[in-house]
């Protein structure tokens, strides 16, 4: 809302860089200032990579985009960076859908699934705040984003052209200003104004900018703006006077009237051509369907300047050619911005895979007359387009992938020393013969100290059998498999930490950020069977799960020293040497990370909701006809929203996998649960 001048970063922290951090900060900063396009920070778990990156940001003084591969990690990074940079613009840009069922068509069943969604108003506000900050002209902007940043947005030039500048004392016609607000997609609401709305009381116009929480009061005297005041829309408390303010659009897709008119002509022309094709091929059903849908959208654009799904016409709105890449958040940055890719070994492949999945779904819609072919150009960036746009990139990972190593020429900046002084756990290779008896002895040795163990097998069947065997010989074990969802997984980890479980067994226990300080033993059976879960990167990741305990130990059961095993042994030995030397030089004694049982219970309490929900929903509750919403009365509000969030994650995953019927079922389940939550809230009021 307020005009903002250029700023510089001010890093706030009670800690100073130490260990490998000063060296890494200097190397990365020099690389950015030197103009290096790609750099990679190899930082072991717990070495303070976010703090290192924050120091680099503060020194290079560029607008920054921080990319993460999921919303949860993005939210964590957003929170950390806001603490490090409280005086700068740290923004959050992720998908604003609480749930999202994409438009789809199943030809085999002749079933159309309409797009359905629930937009999170707060995240939408934060997204608008992001674009507003980037176009405000300030340089001290850090945007934390998921891969949503590579999906299509409106033209930044069109968006910027619509910004309305207000100054106290300027000549401004009141009615013209109201028309400008409507053209920016602000809605008049004289009863309950909120973000993106305004109310009119004579010569006083109150509005809440779409990206702000505070309101702006514009007082007119004739055709002049007499005053601008910021106030709290809820309490009415005046917070201060302003000399000037900027009003930004309330939507991300926006076009000037002339641009919209030209786009509608282009849409009409494309529709006519496509209808001729369909009718020529005697596909009359598809032709009728396409004509009805498109003409309805055109009518909405004519009357309102907007329509549901307007992003599918973004090629015409932006005046782009067929196949030309769409505008996205990256286009809102100045030319010299810096990109930081967190967990790059996961995030970069995710970016590479976005285009194909999106195209395959939309191609079916186009083929069967639900969308014009131009909808295919409302898409995420191709990986090649992404790499062309970004001027400078720092990849951050404990195990950098081939994509980033290739672009960095194999040169990485290392950060191997942890602030706690903990060393990478030693790795030992033992023969396969007698591996179960040997493993059992190791487990008992570690659990006798109160520690826990992770065991990775080659197949699901082997994991189940081993879990059964451990139970028979008195080991408290649990089998963790791929079908277990997030909250249930948290419940199992809670049992592990609380002492109810001593051993976790599974095929793939590889989870970035799996924080288990109680684990001192990691065992990998059949480690010499090369494959995705036995390659160098995977073996290093899973071995790192024992790196939070001073007694950490890793054992590979293998008869053949594969290339992957040898690389892990060599890399572990190298890291331990560096870490040991640093500890000896600085008199540091390694200590395990400690967490109290109260901390464990507090961080995993939402798992109780999952257990009660599943027991009631699919047990007694289901038999007695109790609806989902009614079950929420036994949950705390925090547990209820955690349950809804978990189901949304499952629904989004189903949609990505094109399991549309499952996603639709979960969508309906979420709607019932949300209805119950709203009913609870109303009853309390």
Curated annotation (Swiss-Prot):
GO molecular function: ATP binding; ATP hydrolysis activity; DNA binding; excinuclease ABC activity; helicase activity
Motif Beta-hairpin location, chain numbering: 96-119
GO biological process: nucleotide-excision repair; SOS response
PROSITE patterns, alphabetized: HELICASE_ATP_BIND_1, HELICASE_CTER, UVR
Cited InterPro entries: Helicase/UvrB_N (IPR006935), Helicase_ATP-bd (IPR014001), Helicase_C-like (IPR001650), P-loop_NTPase (IPR027417), UVR_dom (IPR001943), UVR_dom_sf (IPR036876), UvrB (IPR004807), UvrB_inter (IPR041471)
Magnesium is among the record's keywords: no
Positions annotated to bind ATP: 43-50
Domain Helicase ATP-binding: 30-188
GO CC aspect terms: cytoplasm; excinuclease repair complex
Localisation: Cytoplasm
Principal location listed in the UniProt entry: cytoplasm
Helicase C-terminal domain location: 435-597
UniProt xrefs under NCBIfam families: PRK05298.1 (NF003673), uvrb (TIGR00631)
Annotated ranges, domain UVR: 641-676
Keyword vocabulary terms for this entry: ATP-binding, Cytoplasm, DNA damage, DNA excision, DNA repair, Excision nuclease, Helicase, Hydrolase, Nucleotide-binding, SOS response
Oligomeric and partner information: Forms a heterotetramer with UvrA during the search for lesions. Interacts with UvrC in an incision complex.
Domain notes: The beta-hairpin motif is involved in DNA binding.
Protein name: UvrABC system protein B
PANTHER family linked to this entry: UVRABC SYSTEM PROTEIN B
CDD domains assigned: DEXHc_UvrB (cd17916), SF2_C_UvrB (cd18790)
Superkingdom, natural source: Bacteria
Role description: The UvrABC repair system catalyzes the recognition and processing of DNA lesions. A damage recognition complex composed of 2 UvrA and 2 UvrB subunits scans DNA for abnormalities. Upon binding of the UvrA(2)B(2) complex to a putative damaged site, the DNA wraps around one UvrB monomer. DNA wrap is dependent on ATP binding by UvrB and probably causes local melting of the DNA helix, facilitating insertion of UvrB beta-hairpin between the DNA strands. Then UvrB probes one DNA strand for the presence of a lesion.
Similarity-based family: Belongs to the UvrB family.
């Amino acid at each position: 809302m307020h005009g903002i001048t250029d700023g510089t970063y001010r890093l706030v922290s009670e800690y100073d860089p130490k260990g490998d951090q000063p060296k890494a900060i200097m190397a990365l900063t020099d690389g950015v200032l030197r103009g290096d396009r790609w750099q990679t920070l190899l930082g072991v778990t717990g070495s303070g990579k976010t703090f290192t990156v924050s120091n680099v940001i503060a020194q290079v003084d560029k607008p920054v985009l921080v990319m993460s591969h999921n919303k949860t990690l993005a939210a964590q990074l957003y929170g950390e960076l806001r603490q490090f940079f409280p005086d700068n613009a740290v923004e959050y840009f992720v998908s604003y859908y609480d749930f999202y069922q994409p438009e789809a068509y199943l030809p085999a069943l002749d079933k159309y699934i309409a797009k359905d969604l629930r937009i999170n108003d707060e995240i939408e506000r934060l997204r608008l705040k992001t674009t507003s900050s980037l176009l405000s002209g300030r340089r001290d902007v850090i945007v934390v984003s998921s891969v949503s940043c590579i999906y299509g947005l409106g033209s930044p030039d069109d968006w910027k052209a619509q910004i309305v500048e207000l100054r106290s004392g300027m000549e401004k016609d009141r009615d013209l200003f109201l028309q400008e607000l409507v053209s920016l997609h602000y809605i008049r609401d004289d009863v309950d104004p909120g973000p993106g709305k305004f109310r009119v009381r004579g010569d006083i116009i109150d509005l809440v900018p779409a990206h702000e929480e505070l309101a702006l009061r514009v007082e007119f005297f004739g055709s002049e703006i007499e005053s601008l005041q910021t106030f709290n829309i809820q309490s009415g408390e005046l917070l201060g006077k302003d000399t000037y303010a900027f009003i930004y659009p309330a939507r991300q897709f926006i076009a000037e009237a002339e641009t919209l008119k030209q786009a509608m002509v282009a849409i009409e022309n494309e529709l006519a051509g496509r209808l001729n094709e369909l009718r020529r091929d005697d596909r009359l059903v598809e032709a009728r369907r396409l004509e009805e849908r498109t003409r309805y959208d055109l009518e909405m654009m004519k009357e309102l300047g907007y329509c549901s799904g307007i992003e599918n016409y973004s090629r015409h709105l932006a005046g782009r050619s067929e196949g030309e890449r769409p505008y996205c958040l990256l286009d809102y940055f100045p030319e010299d911005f810096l990109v930081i890719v967190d967990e790059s070994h996961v995030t970069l492949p995710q970016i590479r895979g976005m285009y194909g999945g999106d195209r395959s779904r939309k191609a079916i819609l186009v083929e069967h007359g639900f969308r014009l072919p131009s909808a295919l150009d409302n898409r995420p960036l191709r990986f090649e387009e992404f790499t062309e746009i970004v001027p400078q990139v720092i990849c951050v990972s404990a195990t950098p992938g081939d994509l980033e190593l290739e672009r960095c020429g194999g040169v990485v900046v290392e950060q191997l020393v942890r602030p706690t002084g903990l060393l990478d756990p030693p790795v030992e290779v033992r023969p396969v013969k007698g591996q179960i008896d040997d493993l059992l002895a190791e487990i008992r040795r570690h659990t006798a100290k109160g520690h826990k163990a992770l065991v990775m097998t080659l197949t699901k069947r082997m994991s189940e059998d081993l879990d059964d065997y451990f139970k028979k010989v008195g080991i408290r074990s649990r089998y963790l498999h791929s079908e277990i969802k997030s909250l249930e997984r948290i419940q199992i980890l809670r049992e592990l930490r609380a002492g109810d479980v001593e051993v976790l067994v599974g095929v793939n226990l590889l989870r970035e950020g799996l924080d288990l300080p109680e684990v001192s033993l990691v065992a990998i059976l059949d480690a010499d069977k090369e494959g995705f879960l036995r390659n160098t990167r995977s073996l290093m990741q899973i071995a790192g799960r024992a790196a939070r305990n001073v007694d950490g130990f890793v054992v590979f059961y293998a008869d053949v020293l594969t290339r992957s095993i040898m690389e892990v042994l060599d890399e572990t030995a190298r890291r331990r040497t560096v870490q040991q030397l640093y500890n000896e030089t600085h008199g540091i004694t390694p200590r395990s990370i400690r967490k109290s049982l109260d901390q464990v219970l507090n961080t995993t309490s939402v798992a109780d909701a999952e257990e009660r929900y599943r027991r009631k929903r699919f047990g007694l509750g289901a038999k007695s006809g109790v609806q989902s919403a009614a079950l929420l009365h036994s949950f705390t509000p925090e547990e209820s929203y955690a349950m809804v969030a978990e189901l949304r994650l499952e629904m989004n995953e189903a949609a990505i996998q094109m399991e549309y019927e499952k996603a639709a079922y979960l969508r309906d389940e979420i709607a019932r649960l949300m209805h119950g939550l709203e009913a609870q809230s109303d009853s309390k009021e």
